[in-house]
């Protein structure tokens, strides 16, 4: 039951300070999407006794366009940040493609967060289910007023009243003030580059941040080893002065993307280019939708089919890809075939139906998939557990293991690393407790999936802290669904580089998989590495720079007097070519921990 708690107590007058990243003027002609004096129109929704709201006066100051602010005190932190939420409906229409500006001012009157800042997530969303957000911005501020300018292009159209401004405030106990709220629509007559923007930053983004040196040490320790090439002559004696060329061919660490299996399996110029990019960029893939239960049963219509999915999986296997399957059970009614709802009053029959599905799909794809997400997003999706009891989760793992004795069987969830820098959310705690329960009950959990759909940056050292928390289970961890918004492409590239570096430096992580790479097939198109026309974005350049340059080993040299050539390289597969006079030999090598030796002999037996 939600109760609106309003307190109109007048508090002391406030002083003013702000920091601006840009001083661009606001373009003329913008239409307001919100009512005049919207602060007075905002309504608070919150669980009983968890928050209170009031209007407070603000001491006038030059350049400050407001004389009052909305003050919200979060008393008890709810499970989800939007459970303490300010809402104001739109009063004008927005059309897909319109250039808009969200502007607001924020300060912390009081906070218990260790950063000394208060937090708010401000968004403009559909006013009904599915609450799609056109813009979603995480902000934080200390005790001085800070202005935020957030330009965006509307991705959907909504008539007046069918969208709403929202401010989520369900964080650690804090008192936050927000003022000067404006939401302007410039239509298509203004370039987004001409609209002011607050440059986002995050702790550790500095080029000389201390964590970077630590990351390099960890990467050298955990992702590299010594490769020794020993060259012998026909008599088996060490051959000095031989030329050695070491060429890396494939990372041991998994770098990958979600892919559309029916596109991988289908002919056509666009699909040819799609496959080409996959083969060039990745050594690991996961299906985006094709293997989800309704798609697997062709309930989402063409072009999904078991035949195309299996054909694509066979091609990927031929090309040497490590393949993730996603997902056997997404335990909410909206994510399973509709007929299962008929069994909501029959737990035994529901258990049987899910068990049979797991066995059928894993049997059909056996030998083609290396690891499965057995269960996806249990924090937000638990209808099946509500009917059957939470012990049914253990049954799902055991059903998968009965068919797949060697595959890694993952649990997967979101908002663990991508929690706005928070390390104490109900979602994180639930995930930890779920993993512990599964292991205690004997479920053969083989890995921990961390989706990583970001809206705002989590500082790299906070990423390490969270990874350490889940590393205690001694299971491989994988980044399974990374994406980061691209409204600021420079920030997108910078954070992609830093996040990848942080996870590559952590010994418990064995893979980094993004949730799509091409704008033409991406659930969040601005997150893609390649634009619709095929051109690469800065985040794509950052990915390639790391994976194929900074973390890639190609080396040339000569054998020493003992016939050996040594190089420290990144773990993975190599091609080694040795030449001496007119003799030449090429052999494959695999560089593992703690190191590998390849012996190349010319002539003889």
Predicted regions and their residues:
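Bacterial N-terminal signal peptides
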Residues: 6-16
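Extracellular and organelle-lumenal recognition/adhesion modules and their flexible linkers in secreted
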Residues: 22-256, 272-276, 303, 326, ...
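Conserved, mostly hydrophobic/aromatic
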Residues: 104, 150, 229, 285, ...
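Substrate-binding cleft and catalytic face of glycoside hydrolase catalytic domains
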Residues: 111, 115, 284-298, 307-417
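Aromatic-rich peripheral "rim/lid" segments of glycoside hydrolase catalytic domains that contact
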Residues: 193-207, 333-336, 342-343, 350, ...
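Aromatic-lined carbohydrate-recognition surfaces of secreted/lumenal glycan-active proteins
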Residues: 255-258, 371-374, 396-428, 447, ...
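Acidic-and-aromatic substrate-binding clefts and catalytic sites of carbohydrate-active enzymes
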Residues: 260-271, 292-307, 334, 379-389, ...
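Short Pro-Gly-centered beta-turn/loop motif in secreted/extracellular proteins
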Residues: 266-281, 566-573
């Amino acid at each position: 039951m939600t109760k609106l708690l309003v307190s109109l107590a007048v508090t002391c007058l406030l002083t003013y300070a702000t920091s601006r990243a840009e001083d661009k003027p606001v373009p003329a002609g913008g239409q307001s999407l919100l009512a005049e004096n919207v602060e007075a129109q905002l309504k608070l929704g919150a669980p009983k006794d968890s928050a209170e709201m009031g209007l407070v006066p603000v001491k006038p100051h030059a350049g400050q366009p407001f004389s009052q602010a909305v003050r919200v005190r979060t008393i008890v932190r709810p499970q989800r940040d939007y459970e303490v939420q300010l809402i104001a409906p739109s009063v004008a229409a927005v059309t897909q493609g319109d250039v808009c500006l969200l502007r607001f001012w924020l300060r912390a009157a009081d906070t218990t967060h260790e950063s000394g800042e208060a937090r708010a997530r401000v968004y403009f969303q559909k006013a009904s289910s599915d609450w799609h957000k056109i813009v979603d911005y995480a902000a934080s501020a200390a005790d001085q007023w800070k202005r935020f300018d957030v330009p965006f292009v509307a991705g959907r159209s909504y008539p007046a009243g069918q969208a709403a401004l929202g401010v989520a405030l369900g964080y650690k106990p804090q008192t936050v003030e927000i003022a000067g709220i404006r939401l302007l629509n410039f239509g298509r007559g203004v370039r987004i580059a001409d609209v002011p923007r607050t440059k986002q930053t995050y702790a550790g983004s500095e080029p000389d941040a201390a964590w970077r040196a630590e990351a390099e040490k960890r990467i050298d320790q955990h992702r590299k080893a010594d490769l020794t090439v020993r060259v012998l002559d026909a008599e088996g004696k060490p051959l000095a002065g031989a030329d050695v060329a070491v060429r890396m061919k494939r990372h041991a660490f998994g770098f990958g993307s979600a892919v559309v299996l029916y596109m991988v399996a289908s002919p056509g110029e666009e699909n040819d280019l799609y496959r080409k990019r996959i083969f060039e960029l990745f050594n690991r893939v996961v299906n985006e939708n094709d293997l989800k239960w309704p798609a697997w049963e062709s309930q989402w219509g063409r072009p999904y089919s078991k035949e195309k999915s299996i054909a694509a999986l066979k091609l990927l296997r031929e090309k040497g890809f490590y393949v993730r399957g996603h997902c056997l059970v997404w335990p909410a009614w909206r994510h399973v075939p509709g007929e299962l709802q008929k069994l909501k009053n029959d737990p035994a029959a529901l258990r049987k139906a899910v068990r049979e599905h797991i066995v059928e799909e894993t049997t059909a794809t056996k030998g083609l998939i290396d690891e499965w997400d057995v269960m996806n997003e249990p924090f937000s999706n638990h209808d099946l557990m509500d009917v059957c009891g939470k012990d049914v989760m253990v049954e799902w793992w055991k059903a998968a293991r009965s068919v797949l004795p060697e595959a890694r069987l993952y649990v997967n969830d979101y908002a663990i690393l991508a929690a706005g820098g928070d390390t104490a959310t109900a979602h994180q705690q639930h995930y930890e407790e779920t993993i512990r329960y599964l292991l205690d009950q004997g479920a053969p959990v083989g890995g921990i999936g961390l989706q990583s759909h970001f809206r705002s940056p989590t500082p790299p050292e906070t990423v390490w802290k969270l990874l350490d928390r889940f590393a205690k289970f001694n299971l491989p961890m994988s980044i399974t669904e990374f994406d980061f918004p691209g409204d600021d492409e420079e920030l997108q590239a910078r954070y992609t580089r830093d996040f990848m570096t942080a996870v590559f430096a952590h010994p418990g992580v064995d893979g980094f998989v993004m949730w799509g790479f091409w704008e033409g097939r991406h659930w969040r198109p601005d997150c893609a590495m390649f634009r619709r026309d095929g051109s690469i974005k800065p985040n794509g350049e950052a990915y390639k720079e790391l994976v194929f340059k900074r973390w890639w080993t190609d080396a040339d040299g000569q054998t020493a007097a003992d016939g050996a050539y040594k190089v420290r390289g990144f773990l993975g597969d190599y091609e080694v070519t040795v030449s001496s006079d007119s003799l030449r030999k090429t052999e494959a090598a695999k560089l593992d921990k703690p190191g590998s030796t390849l012996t190349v002999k010319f002539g003889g037996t």
